[in-house]
Structures are given as C-alpha cells and as structure tokens.
Amino acid sequence: PLVDIRAAGTNHFTWIVSIHDKRTGEDLYPLLRKRFFELDESFEPLTRRVFRDFGLFPVPGDTHLCEYLPWMSGPVAKPWEKFNIRLYDWELMAGVRDFSLDRLNEMADGNMTIDGLLETDSEGALEMIENVAYGGNHYHLAANLPNVGQIPNLPWGTTVETPVHVNGAGIHPVHVGPLPEPIAELCRRELIVAQLGVDAAGEGSYEKALQCLLLGPVIMDMETSRSVLDDYLQTYKEHLPQFWK
C-alpha cells in the first residue's frame, strides 16, 4: 500500500487518527476530509455528521457506528429515520447461517471438498498465525490487544484496537498516542459497559447487569432497561443459573 493509515479505539469502534503518503510523508487527512465531504450527502450521513462534529473519521460505517452512540436510539426524535439506518434482515442472515453450517458439515463429513474455502477472506487471522508460526514480519491495520499504553488516555489493561506488528515473537501493538478527549470518552463508556457485562455474568450480579444496560447507548430510559433485563434472564434462565441462586 502507498498510504499509511492508522486507526485506533475500541473493538469495531475506531477512528482514523492519521493518514500519510508513504513515499513523501505528506499528511493526507486534509485531502480525505475534502474528498469525503464532496460525496453525495446521502452517502453514510451519520458518518458525515460525526466526522464533521468530532474532527476524526469514524471507521465502522453508519449501521455499525450507530450502535455506539448515545443519541441514536431516541423514540421521539427517531434519528434512525433522519440518517436512514436500517435494521439487519434477520431472516436472511439466519438463512445464510444455516446454509454455511450445512456446507461446513458436508466438508467435515468428506462429502464436499474444502476448495471453496481457500479464497475466503481471513480478515487477518491466517496472516497473523502464519507470521507468528514461521517468524515473518507482518503489519496489520487492526487487532485487539490489552492496552499497555498504545492509547494512553484509555484505561490500562482494557482491550483496545490499533495497528499491530506480527512476527515470530508474537503480536505487538503500535503506539498511536492519545485520542481526542471527546472521542476517548465515548470509547471509555464502551469499555465500562463491556466490563460490567463480564462482571455481571461472572458474578451473577443483577445490579451490575442492570448498570450495564443503563450505561449502554441503545436504551433510553430506566424502566425499559429493567424490563429488558428481567425478560432476558427469564427467557435464558436455564443458561444463567448464577442469577437465580
């Protein structure tokens, strides 16, 4: 690649912090900003608004970005209509899942060759395994690792997403520096929500599970949070005995 792009944040919630021409070192962020805002306003309108208001380009795309933003679920304003956010087609995805599972079972039983998998995009896993196992030297644009200072203004030890170097000694995070504080605060909220969810499940803590939902960006009132939790715990009671001691 002729362009060095660095993005950082939390899992799937990353922001381009720098973009440079590898040959000349030129900062390409002004060009990215210019070209993106020249696109039709109907293209990724939520990304456009967040880019404008926060100053960095959010990577996920509108239908994923909306999951992390606390102002995208209000039932009165209905921002999903303004930004043309559509739900996933659950029936379609369920069909794809069942088809894929049947196909894999056929391969496992020897009734189908694995040739169809050879060109499947690995999303980086294959390259990482190969370079660790065989002592290679690979630069990967995004991977999740514990924060050991690669993003110094996010909590130490939490899982963050940054570029990484991969070689025979393992996977090593690239230091990207601090995120702008408003963006860091959005990421911190996600990290706290994730930790509360883990702690709630591990401890069987109703209180922490409720706090997880109350802090999450997609439920807008306290009663709904409690109702969702109660319904979930009742529906999956047999799988969550720690909450029923």
What are these regions (language model features)?
Residues 1-245:
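Long, compositionally biased stretches enriched for glycine and/or charged residues
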